[in-house]
Amino acid sequence: MPARPIPVPLLALALAAALAVPSPAAAARVKELADVVGVRENALYGYGLVVGLAGTGDSERVLFTQQSVAGMLGRLGIRIDPKDVRARNVAAVMVTARLPPFARPGTRIDVAVASMGNARSLAGGLLLVTPLAGGDGKVYAVGQGPVQVAGYDAGAGGAELRKNTPTSGRVAGGAAVERAVDFALGQAPLVLALRRPDLTTASRLAAAVNAKLGAGTARAVDPAAVELSPPAARKDDVVGFLAEIELLEVEADQRARVVVSERTGTVVAGEGVRLRPVAVAHGGLQVRVQRDPAVSQPAPFGAGRTVEATRDRAAATEAAGGVVALPATASVQDLARALDLLGASPRDLVAVLEAIRAAGALDAELEVLE
């Protein structure tokens, strides 16, 4: 049945092509879908000084930098009043790092450095010895080394030239692990935590483990967790047991979702997104969407075969307004094809999708990014 026109906005759809075409779900390894509870990174932080700056460090107005310099010199046997510190080649910084799971003493990790005062640039600076503590207050690593900055800040006579953010940088391999996190596999119940909780995925994961290692090995506790019970013969080989599970392939499921970024104009439609029949009035353009069945016949005496296809047509004309019904479309892609011919703004596209969802005609979650 031919479609009737529907008013839609005049906008520029820079990315209607970004709408995903539904496709069969692909299986993924368990290690891409879940993590072992307790096996995770830990955040480290510390306060330090960066020296060797070419006059781009903190000014004397930053009192904590003066106090830090005086305190550091005091530990070296040099006594000085913090008020007398006038060094512009020093900057107070906050140092952060990520402690990988199972990191042993001596392991090198990267650290991030960010200025806390009014330093203009950390380029060319050297991070002095900085203890890095965890949330429990214990020191797990010590950082030190040259700071690498992906930017610059130069100026003279009131003119200034800046690129990126020169007040933050990194020290590659700049920290040595001094203490390992107290955790051992097998001491606590083994649980896999899904990165994207889903009842179907959790059930499929447990079924795949039981099919491979025997019934009762895995049990889906909730959408986010699968509890593992190693067989008696594998209790002393927890690492091998988990490694075998990590390589299993599971077809992950997820809720249908449309993600829209109004700022960049990016639109991504996940698998399973569908539209119901809906009437929309927005702006002063009419969009006609029509999908006709078609048959592709091979040439006489050819080696091909007859296949079923669809012929999509979309047209747009300016109208004075009015509301008419849009026939059911198979997916968001059909709506995108119609809008793609118009040239419509991402802001109006977001409004259309939100209105369709509010009307109950979008069988998916709509997530609008800032």
Curated annotation (Swiss-Prot):
UniProt keyword terms in alphabetical order: Bacterial flagellum, Periplasm, Signal
GO molecular function: structural molecule activity
Cell location: Periplasm; Bacterial flagellum basal body
Signal peptide: 1-27
Matching Pfam families: FlgI (PF02119)
Record's GO cellular component terms: bacterial-type flagellum basal body, distal rod, P ring; outer membrane-bounded periplasmic space
Entry annotated with the keyword Signal: yes
Membership in a protein family: Belongs to the FlgI family.
Subunit structure: The basal body constitutes a major portion of the flagellar organelle and consists of four rings (L,P,S, and M) mounted on a central rod.
Entry protein name: Flagellar P-ring protein
Record lineage: Bacteria, Pseudomonadati, Myxococcota, Myxococcia, Myxococcales
Gene: flgI
